[in-house]
C-alpha cells in the first residue's frame, strides 16, 4: 500500500487540475416499532459522507472513494473505510487494477451466493449488500473465448458486527478483537480468485473459483457462557456458477456454489426468474414479477421469495420494490418494501420498511428471523450528491 500511495501521489501532482471531484452525504433515520430484545432504543440515526475523486486518461483511470459513517446509538456501526483507491491501466486486450476496490459477482436479486471478493459490512443491513473495500491486484484478459479475471487479494477484512446498542443484530455479543484464523498467516494470508465470463446469444454465463479465508466466519464460544462469541475464519475453496438467460421479457437467473473447508463440502444455490410487463395499462410504468428459491445442503429450510418491481420511467427515476420471503419449514414470513425517487438534480430520497411475522408454531426448527423478531422498522434516507 505504501508503494501504491507513492504512485498515486505523483499521479495526482501531475494531473491535479484534470480531476473530477464528486461525493455524497447521506442522512438516515430508522424507526423501530418495538423496543429491542436487549432494550435498545426505537430511533437510530446515522450520517455518512463519501467524497470521491475520479480521473480518466487515454489508458489510465484513477478512483478514490473513502466512506465515513457515524451512528447515533451504536459505536460499532461507526465506519472509516476506503471503498475505492486504485489505478486501472487499460490495454488493448488487458486491464490491470492495483489498489483497493469493490467487485460484485452475481445475477440474482436476493441472495448472492457467488459474491465473495469483498467482506460484508453487516452493520449496514442484514441483506449483505454493503461491502468493505478489498486490497487487490486484478488482471483482466478479454479474448474471443470470453473475459478472464484473475485476483490476488491482500490484507483480509474481518466482518463488521453491530454492538450491544445496535439493532438488526444477532442475539449475542461478538468480540471481533479475539478473532481466530485457521491459516497460520491469520489476516495476512493472500487469497486468490479467478472468474471466466462470456455470453452466447441470450445466455450470460460465469464460472468462478476462490481459494482463501472465508468471508463468513463461524461463531464459537470463548470458554464461558456469559462471554462474547469469537469469529473463527476457516480456509476454504469455492467454485461458483452464474447463469442469466433472457427470453423476451423473461429473465431466468441461477447462482450456485460448491464449497469445501467449513466441515463437509456442501452446495448452495439461488434460482428464479423476473418477468417484466412493459407499459402496463398503456402507461410508461413497467411491472416486474420476481420469484426466487433457495437451497443449502446444510439446512432443512429453503426460503422462497416473491416480489414485484415497479419502474415508473419518469424523469425522477421513481421505483418501488416489494417482496415476501416465506420459510416453509419454520413457518415464518417477512415483508420488505423499498422505494426511491430523485428530488431535483442533486438529491435522492429513499424509503424502506421491513416486517417479520412468526406463526408461533413450535416445530423444533431453527427460526430464520428469530434474531430480528422485535426489529420491524421503517427507514427514511436522504442523499445529497455533491
Q: Language-model segments: which ranges?
A:
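Outer-membrane beta-barrel translocator domains and adjoining extracellular loop/strand segments
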Residues: 33-42, 73-81, 109-115, 161-167, ...
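Outer membrane beta-barrel
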Residues: 54-167, 201, 358
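Outer-membrane beta-barrel "beta-signal"
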Residues: 273, 355, 372-386
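Residues on the lipid-exposed face of transmembrane beta-strands in outer-membrane beta-barrel proteins
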Residues: 49-55, 84-89, 137-141, 194-198, ...
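Detector for outer-membrane/organellar transmembrane beta-barrel domains
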Residues: 247-327
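Repeated loop/turn-to-beta-strand initiation elements of outer-membrane beta-barrel proteins
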Residues: 58-63, 93-96, 145-148, 202-205, ...
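Residues that define the transmembrane beta-barrel architecture of outer-membrane proteins
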Residues: 39-47, 78-83, 131-135, 142, ...
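Transmembrane beta-barrel strands of outer-membrane/channel proteins
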Residues: 25-31, 64-68, 98-100, 150-154, ...
Amino acid at each position: 500500500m505504501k508503494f501504491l500511495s507513492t504512485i498515486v501521489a505523483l499521479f495526482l501532482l501531475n494531473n491535479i487540475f484534470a480531476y473530477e471531484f464528486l461525493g455524497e452525504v447521506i442522512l438516515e433515520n430508522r424507526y423501530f416499532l418495538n423496543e429491542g430484545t436487549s432494550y435498545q432504543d426505537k430511533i437510530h440515526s446515522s450520517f455518512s459522507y463519501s467524497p470521491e475523486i475520479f480521473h480518466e486518461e487515454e489508458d489510465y483511470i484513477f478512483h478514490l472513494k473513502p466512506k465515513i459513517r457515524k451512528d447515533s446509538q451504536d459505536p460499532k456501526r461507526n465506519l472509516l473505510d476506503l471503498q475505492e483507491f486504485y489505478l486501472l491501466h487499460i490495454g488493448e486486450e488487458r486491464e490491470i487494477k492495483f489498489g483497493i476496490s469493490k467487485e460484485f459477482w452475481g445475477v440474482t436479486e436476493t441472495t448472492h451466493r457467488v459474491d465473495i471478493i469483498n467482506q460484508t459490512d453487516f452493520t449496514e443491513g442484514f441483506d449483505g449488500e454493503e461491502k468493505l473495500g478489498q486490497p487487490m491486484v486484478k488482471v483482466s484478459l478479454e479474448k474471443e473465448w470470453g473475459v478472464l479475471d484473475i485476483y490476488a487479494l491482500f490484507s483480509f477484512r474481518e466482518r463488521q458486527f453491530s454492538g450491544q446498542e445496535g439493532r438488526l443484530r444477532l442475539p449475542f455479543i461478538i468480540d471481533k478483537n479475539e478473532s481466530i484464523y485457521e491459516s497460520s498467516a491469520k489476516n495476512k494470508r493472500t487469497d486468490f480468485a479467478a472468474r471466466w465470463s462470456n455470453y452466447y446469444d441470450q445466455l450470460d454465463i460465469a464460472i468462478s473459483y476462490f481459494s482463501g479465508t472465508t468471508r463468513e466466519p463461524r461463531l464459537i464460544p470463548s470458554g464461558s457462557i456469559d462471554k462474547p462469541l469469537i469469529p473463527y475464519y476457516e480456509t476454504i475453496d469455492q467454485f461458483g456458477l452464474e447463469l442469466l438467460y433472457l427470453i423476451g421479457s423473461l429473465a431466468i437467473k441461477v447462482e450456485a456454489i460448491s464449497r469445501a473447508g467449513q466441515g463437509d463440502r456442501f452446495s448452495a444455490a439461488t434460482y428464479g426468474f423476473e418477468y417484466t410487463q412493459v407499459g402496463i395499462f398503456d402507461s410508461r410504468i413497467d411491472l416486474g414479477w420476481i420469484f426466487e428459491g433457495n437451497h443449502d445442503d446444510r439446512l432443512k429450510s429453503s426460503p422462497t421469495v416473491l416480489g414485484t418491481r415497479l419502474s415508473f420511467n419518469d424523469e425522477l427515476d421513481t421505483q418501488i420494490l416489494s417482496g415476501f420471503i416465506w420459510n416453509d419449514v419454520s413457518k415464518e414470513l417477512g415483508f420488505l418494501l423499498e422505494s426511491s425517487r430523485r428530488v431535483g438534480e442533486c438529491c435522492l430520497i429513499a424509503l424502506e420498511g421491513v416486517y417479520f411475522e412468526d406463526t408461533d408454531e413450535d416445530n423444533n426448527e431453527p427460526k430464520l428471523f428469530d434474531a430480528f423478531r422485535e426489529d420491524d422498522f421503517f427507514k427514511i434516507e436522504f442523499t445529497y450528491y455533491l
